[in-house]
Amino acid sequence: MFDKNIYVERRKQLQHAVGSGLVVLLGNEESSMNYKDNLYPFRQDSSFLYFFGIDRPALIGIIDIDNDSEIIFGDDFTTEEMIWTGYREPLNLLSDSIGVSIVKPRKDLWSFMRLATEHKKTIHFLPPYRPEQHDLLADLLGVSSGSLSGMFSISLIKAIVAQRSYKSAVEIEEINRAVNTTAAMQLAAITLAKAGMTEAQIAGKMQEIAIGAGGNLSFPTILTQQGQILHNGYSHSLLTAGNLVLSDCGAETGMHYAGDLTRTFPVSNTFTTIQRDVYDIVLHAHGSAVALLQPGKPFRDVHLHACEKLTEGLQELGVMKGDAKEAVSMGAHALFFPCGLGHMMGLDTHDMENLGEQYVGYNDEIKKSTQFGLKSLRLAKPLEEGFVVTVEPGLYFNPALIDEWEANNQLGSFINYEKLKAYRNLTGIRVEEDFVITQNGSRVLGNPLAKTANEIEVLRLG
């Protein structure tokens, strides 16, 4: 946990922003894999962690704004339960460590909420993303499950986004720790991978590093020779000479702050000419985008700039043609880059995504596009000091998508389908780093990690 005063001040700020009513923040429950006592690793809700800090299941945090009081509802472990789990600190001591003096049994929550409803208090809660949260809220509010979806509090969402978007110095330190562990995971992948090993073997080594550092993965590792499939995970496929490996991974610290880095490397230790040409295009787009990071710059503009650089690079290879800006405005580049340039990062890898992209990544002036590729951009609004963002351009050659576009000569004035044939099986290349926006620009997070094609080859050659 952070210092007690950090949690106290966070809740005061939230109380002031919301103004009145009752804020209900649900912690997560344990989740069973296949029977009650065989559990998935517990992961606390990120907003509960941000305001209440206690990493324990089945807790509910209440901020009663009108009465200026805070309550945690939950139960201590029984002696019988601790035979199986080991000692668990009493909840009143944990609550005291984050500045909450009132602790009540979970069973008292129903009468508390019923009284709040009878007094016509405004009850603020976040959209639930787990079925058990959904059912609990419906039960507490005395409404049907079907009617709950329209009842969540937009004012609470906006208030939480406004707080969690700006990372404090202690949060940056924690994120930097996560990125350092993530860099160690990537270094292991680049140096250990050999033809004949499986993707899963490498992913297992990476997870070992994350757990050994005191945390876990911040998301399931993407370690694949099919990098054109954006979230392909890993398999038991053998690493094969001539292929590229796209490695996108993240570590999470013990306090659940995330890292997220991507590197692409050749199984054969050196890139082929075609692979290196495309890799250098991606790397140039990455550097060009990073140079634009600064407060006030809409991230959508950074994304579109990177798209233009990717397009210009493909034009030099003869794969694309025409005016680069026009090609991007028409969405021709999305055949090769059908996703966004990056996202916010913090307690979640895609920070606060459960609260809604329209609130986290957009604003009243900048709305989500419906265009293929651009509609997948998670962050578009102007950057501000204290934001933590990823920058992750890539080029992806998906044969199924290429065939579909070519069959219709889709945007054929910008794409040379004949030249593209030489690249259709290249798979995918992505380079990703994490940045904090500073007063005058940005700063890369984490220890240095090989990034250029030459640096990658030096590591591969050992």
Q: What is each residue range found by the language model?
A:
Residues 1-462:
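Active-site neighborhoods and metal-handling regions in enzymes and metal-associated proteins
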